[in-house]
Each structure stands twice: as structure tokens, then as C-alpha cells.
């Protein structure tokens, strides 16, 4: 009997603690606050497809950096702008990663510029789960990195959309650290309509500039 009473008391205590954390999370005030974020990511080319089938991208995983600005129109809802930079080496062309200036390979570069919508689910006071989507366009170039002659390189601007989620640890009321994962799609229209797919895994840092 004492054992069951002890278990019930522990359960009541845990429930009380969780209720307090949930109440604290509900009281987190971000309304009208602005945040800045930085991402360091690995961009993994998955595939591209046309209307009939999917094809390999023939690109290595590459690096990505991003800077993000968001404004909270509601406590848990934010809108903002995001600028990313991405590069991927072509598998079919050799390069020397230790001496990139001597490489003769081709590289795909992309600069996505997007509008973002982010909804945040708070888990107590310690964690937050952002669910986000981005829409905008990407400035892309592909070709021989050692030759800037126009006919050896391609340039285009493609509509871009993404969606993703993650988890961030609230270090304090100013800073949060964590990781996110997202799926990015770039669209090419016209007679040879195609869609490229990239998976991004990111380490993220955000700061509430109103709290600084």
C-alpha cells in the first residue's frame, strides 16, 4: 500500500510541475519582438524530376550558410526574410578539396532569397519546436569555376519553396540553440519543366534582439 501511495504522490508532483511549465510557456511573451538567426547547414541534393521520372542530381553534399530575420506578429507566429548561400560540387568533374583554387570541376551555386512563416510550439520554458515554410526564388549558377565565360556557365532565377521543423534549447530569454531539418524545392518551368529537391540539416542560433 505504501508503495502505491508513493507512486501516486510522485505522479501528482510530476503533473503539478508539468502544469507549471505549460503555464510558464503560455506566458512567454514574444509579441512584436524581432529575432535574428544564423544557420550552418549541410545541403544534400536528393534528386530532380520532370513530369515523367526522377533523376540523380550528380552533385556532392555541400555547405550552406544562412542569416534570418523574423518579426513576431503573434506570440507564437512570426514572419520574416531569409538569405542563404549554398554550393555543391559536380560528381562527374574532379576537384581537389584541399586546394580548391586548382580545381577544374564544375560547381552549382545557389542563393535562395525567401519570405518565411514560422510557428513555434513551446515545450515548457526550456525548448521550442519551430515549424516553418519559405517561399521565394533562388539565384543559381552552374559551370566551370575557373572560367567565367558566359557560354561555359549557366545563370537562372528559379521559384523556390521549402518546409521544415526542428528543436531549439532556450539557453536563456535571449538566446536559443538547436537543430532543424528542411526540404527545399526549386522549380524550372517551360518546355523542359523540372523540379530539384534538396534536404538541409542545420545547426541554428537565434537571438531575441528586443531582449539585448
UniProtKB/Swiss-Prot annotation:
Subcellular location: Membrane
Assigned GO CC terms: membrane
Transmembrane segments annotated in the record for this chain: 5-25
Superkingdom as given in the UniProt entry: Bacteria
Keyword set, alphabetical order: Membrane, Transmembrane, Transmembrane helix
NCBIfam families: OMP_BB0027
Protein name: Uncharacterized protein BB_0027
Organism: Borreliella burgdorferi (strain ATCC 35210 / DSM 4680 / CIP 102532 / B31) (Borrelia burgdorferi)
Species lineage: Bacteria, Pseudomonadati, Spirochaetota, Spirochaetia, Spirochaetales
